[in-house]
Amino acid sequence: IDFGCGHGWLLAELAVDTEIERLTGVDFDDKCIAGARRRIGSAVGPRGTDKVKLLEGLFTHRDQDFLGHDVVAAIEVVEHLEPPQLDAFVGVAFDYVRPARAVVTTPNAEYNVVWHTRRTRGRRHPDHRFEWSRNEFAEWSQKIGTAHGYAVYVVPLGSIHPVWGPPTQIAVFDRAR
C-alpha cells in the first residue's frame, strides 16, 4: 500500500511486476488519484489495472481497505504532515496495518544548503511542515521501530555530499517475528 501515492509513480513501477498480486494507493487529492489511474493504465494496460485499487482519502484514519498488505510505503510524504497527523499515520501504518515491512523516505534537511532553498523557508517545498536532519530521522525511525516491534535500518538515497550527506533518506522497518 502506497500512502500518499501522488500521481502513481511507484504504483506504476510495481504494477508491471507479475509476482505482486495486489496494490493499493491512497491520496487525498482527487487530481493525484486521476493522474495515478492514467499512469498505471499506461504502464500495464486495462487488464493490469485490476490488481490496483486507488482510494481518495486520508491514510491517517483506519480503513479496512488498508488491511492485508505486506508492505507500507510512504515516499516523501511524512514531511507534509503536521505532528498530530504524523502520529495518526504511525498508528495506522504500524498498529493497524502492521505490515511485514514499511519503507519511509524523507528529505535530508542538511542537504538543503546545496540546493539554496531560501525561497521556501529553507525547505524544499512550501508545503513541507518540517524536514529532518539525518540524526533526527534516524532517532524518529528508531523510536517508532522500538515502540511498534520493528527492526529499523536507515540508508542514504542519492549522491552523498561529503559534508551534508544525501539529498534523501530511507528508513526500512522490518517487523520482528
Residue positions per predicted region:
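Hydrophobic adenine-recognition pocket in adenosine-nucleotide-binding enzymes
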Residues: 77
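Conserved SAM-binding motif I beta-strand of class I
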Residues: 22-27
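Conserved class I S-adenosyl-L-methionine
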Residues: 1-6
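S-adenosyl-L-methionine-dependent methyltransferase catalytic module, highlighting the catalytic core
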Residues: 7-9, 28-69, 73, 81-177
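Conserved SAM-binding loop of SAM-dependent methyltransferases across substrates and taxa
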Residues: 7-19
